[in-house]
């Protein structure tokens, strides 16, 4: 047992993994009530963000952009398609590939979604500079996990 003069490297509150998991869980829960009026869950919102950046997209490319397996992405797409926000079709350039594109309703939803980031920051009680610093720190951790082990 460590003394009060030493710092326990195994203390739960010192673990980056614990901070990431608990923060992610809580931040995602803040999105729920903000996204509900749009008819979206947080995972569906992420899909829509990726498609608002670039549509149409091949399923494989969309899954990669979201860091998801295509099998995990497929049920999300099915629900978005049932809601009339996207459509899935065979890629005209490659019959084996599936292309995902926004419908007119999906494009129109973007206008309403523009308010989401501001509402989230308001609910979190932090400003743009803090959010940008946190995002940059998280992206640095993400990049470090993608580098070869030293």
Say what each PLM segment does.
Residues 1-38, 132-133, 140-145:
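N-terminal leader segment of winged-helix/HTH proteins
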Residues 8-9, 51-52, 96-97:
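Short secondary-structure capping/turn micro-motifs that flank functional sites
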Residues 28, 56, 78-136:
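Charged, amphipathic alpha-helical coiled-coil/dimerization segments
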Residues 18, 25-69, 150:
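N-terminal helix-turn-helix DNA-binding core of bacterial DNA-binding proteins
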Residues 123-125, 145-150:
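Amphipathic alpha-helical linker/stalk segments
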Residues 33, 37, 53, 79, ...:
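Conserved amphipathic alpha-helical interaction elements at protein-protein interfaces in regulatory
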């Amino acid at each position: 047992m460590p003394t009060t003069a030493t710092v326990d490297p195994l203390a739960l509150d010192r673990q980056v993994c614990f901070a990431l998991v608990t923060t992610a869980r809580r931040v995602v829960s803040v999105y729920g009530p903000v996204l509900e009026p749009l008819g979206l869950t947080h995972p569906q919102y992420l899909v829509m963000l990726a498609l608002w950046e670039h549509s149409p997209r091949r399923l494989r490319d969309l899954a990669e952009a979201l860091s998801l397996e295509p099998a995990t992405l497929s049920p999300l797409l099915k629900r978005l398609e049932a809601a009339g926000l996207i459509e899935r079709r065979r890629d005209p350039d490659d019959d084996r590939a599936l292309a995902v594109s926004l419908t007119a309703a999906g494009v129109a939803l973007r206008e309403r979604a523009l308010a989401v980031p501001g509402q989230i920051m308001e609910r979190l009680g932090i400003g743009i500079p803090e959010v940008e610093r946190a995002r940059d720190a998280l992206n640095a951790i993400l990049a470090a996990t993608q580098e070869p082990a030293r």
